[in-house]
């Protein structure tokens, strides 16, 4: 009986220890040297198991956050307004982003849907929005380039960005990576005037896509939604002044670009 009790206590102790090991957050990836201004980007996926730890982010020195607002013309992140407001209340620079769906066409409609759900304040803490252009996730049943030719894809992107710029008064930012951008756009070089946020999970600065001579933000580490506080990690290429330059009051509005001819796409 005593032996059985001892074995039971041992087994329970191991179970508790195992659960603690699983639940203990892994240390976040080290911020690259020479890039002092760090931030995060989040979506509804980051709420699957844990709340967003805004106080912890401020304590670790996080200075900005991007929050996913929409995708396509039908999905709006249910956590967007709460996360956006919490980040602002924590004193962070905050921006919104949209996950583009080239496979669904209607780039102007997608841009307008995004603007109808995002929060815009022309102050010194609201960051220019970005358009997420990357590989389709597992639930999107297309090839890596959304079943589009480079000409079709770049036409979609131009129409999307033109609509945002016309309505916002300044160029939006593009989020992408060289490994997707170059083959899917055919090494198109016509987007270099836009600020770019590059995903590159390495210890050295990201490889630039065709058309760019520098980057604005570097996403240097991916998040893991199974770990508390482990979010996508970013740094600004520069210092605090470069982050502030992405806020509304730091750049004078630019003239709206001319609308491009209507763009359509076949149904997938």
What do these predicted regions represent?
Residues 168-183:
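Aromatic-lined carbohydrate-recognition surfaces of secreted/lumenal glycan-active proteins
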Residues 31-167:
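Substrate-binding cleft of extracellular glycoside hydrolase catalytic domains
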Residues 31-44, 50, 189-268:
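Functionally critical loop-and-helix segments that line ligand-binding/catalytic clefts
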Residues 1-30:
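Secretory targeting and sorting signals
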Residues 115-130, 135-138, 186-214:
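Structural recognition of alpha->loop->beta junctions
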Residues 106-110, 182-190:
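Glycine-rich, charge-decorated loop segments at or immediately adjacent to ligand/cofactor-binding or catalytic sites
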Residues 94, 170-172, 196:
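Hydrophobic anchor at the start of a short beta-strand
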Residues 42, 67, 131-133, 174-177, ...:
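Conserved beta-strand positions
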